[in-house]
Regions:
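Substrate-binding groove of N-acetylhexosamine-processing glycoside hydrolases
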Residues: 1-257
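Extracytoplasmic
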Residues: 222-382
Length: 382
């Protein structure tokens, strides 16, 4: 959990297990091997991440050989049995992936500890109607699967399941439903009553949490921040943004050539890769219609490992850019945006020749570079 800028996340335990693994493995490799300290404040509902951290601290090599996905599956099998674990693991992996893109606590587009009062007001995320509906559908599918398992569970397992699976997945789904449906409703594209029903569902789920075995353990409104309230009804005359269509998209693992370490499950598509210093990844594409291309590079927004820099270059058909830096300073505006969306983004327009095929080469110039995605766009018309 976290208290502070740009926004708290004290409610649900959505820190991605693969991020815990990537960061702590990196720390161990860099010599932090004598003592790891875990601050256990709000343990519920972060039990799995706590167990993963402690297992890594006790025997990192064993977890490394097992892999994060297998470690999580073992956790679910221990609690719910083999067959149910087979069905639940994809559900939990997708729940972590969706929350990696945007945490439930960040869905109101608000911030904490800012002087400008606008950051206390629920406002639109920069997402198109298509992107909103796709995210709502993904959460709806997860919630339905969780509910199916709930009805099939033996009575002695229901409290554990509610705590570890049902509440965190369905509460996150309803938080997204509450705020994204409200965003659509502000533009006349959804019913405000659906947003209100999502809020009521969170209240009901939390009441269920706090009236049985886990009495008084869960608060769905930490610090009583605006994002946790019922959404105020208001109309906007402006339209929702259109989704910009990329011509080519790759995740880190899509490279045609190169050596990297896949960060199992990490990233917007679960395919981010760690690229060692001076190592290259090659991506190939075919004929391009214009004489230039806009390249958008999306990276894990981590801290520098050596010195104070995080840099890479992009080479298109042998013509390289200068070093591109993406490290940030804590509490800067860019740092806040990176935390909220879990990506550091750099864009550049490069010339492209008229030929049948092209090679785009990504080169890491520092240790600690993790590539998530690369998008190619037709340049914007000025």
């Amino acid at each position: 959990s976290y208290w502070g800028r740009p926004h708290d996340y004290l409610w649900l335990g959505t820190v991605h297990p693969s991020l815990v693994y990537q960061q702590m493995s990196l720390a161990y490799e860099r010599g932090i091997q004598k003592m790891w300290i875990l601050n256990v404040g709000d343990i519920k509902p972060a039990e799995y991440q706590v167990e993963l951290f402690l297992d890594m601290a006790w025997n990192l090599e064993a977890v490394k050989q097992q892999g994060v996905a297998a470690h999580q599956r073992h956790f679910l099998e221990r609690e719910f049995g083999k067959n149910r674990a087979d069905r639940l693991q994809p559900v939990m992996q997708e729940a972590y992936r969706l929350a990696y893109i945007r945490k439930p606590e960040f869905m109101g587009n608000t911030r904490t500890e800012e002087k400008d009062p606008k950051f206390k007001v629920i406002s639109d995320l920069p997402w198109s109607e298509q992107e909103i509906n796709e995210r709502l559908a993904a959460y709806r599918q997860l919630s339905d699967k969780v509910e199916q398992e709930w009805h099939a569970l033996p009575a002695q397992k229901k409290e554990t399941y509610f705590q570890l699976v049902k509440y965190p997945v369905q509460a996150a789904a309803q938080m997204n439903n509450k705020l994204l449906t409200a965003q659509l409703a502000r533009h006349g594209k959804a019913d405000w009553a659906d947003s209100d029903r999502a809020y009521d569902s969170i209240v009901s789920l939390t009441k269920r949490y706090n009236t049985t075995k886990w009495n008084r353990m869960m608060d769905f409104q930490p610090r009583r921040l605006p994002v946790f309230n019922r959404v105020e009804r208001k109309a906007l005359s402006s339209g929702l943004p259109e989704k910009r269509q990329a011509v080519y998209t790759w995740n880190g693992a899509d490279c045609a050539e190169g050596v990297s370490a896949i960060c199992e499950g990490l990233g917007y598509e679960g395919k981010a890769v760690a690229v060692s210093k001076n190592k290259e990844l090659t991506f190939e594409f075919t004929a391009w219609e214009t004489d230039s291309v806009e390249v958008e590079v999306r990276l894990l927004p981590n801290h520098p490992v050596e010195g104070e820099r995080l840099r890479f270059t992009i080479s298109l058909d042998g013509s390289a850019t200068e070093a591109v830096s993406y490290e940030t300073k804590g509490r800067s505006e860019e740092w806040k945006e990176n935390v909220l969306c879990n990506q550091a983004v750099r864009r550049m327009v490069l010339p492209v020749a008229r030929k049948a095929s092209h090679r785009l080469i990504f080169t890491a110039l520092d240790e600690g570079v993790v590539l998530d995605q690369i998008y190619l766009y037709m340049p914007r018309i000025k």
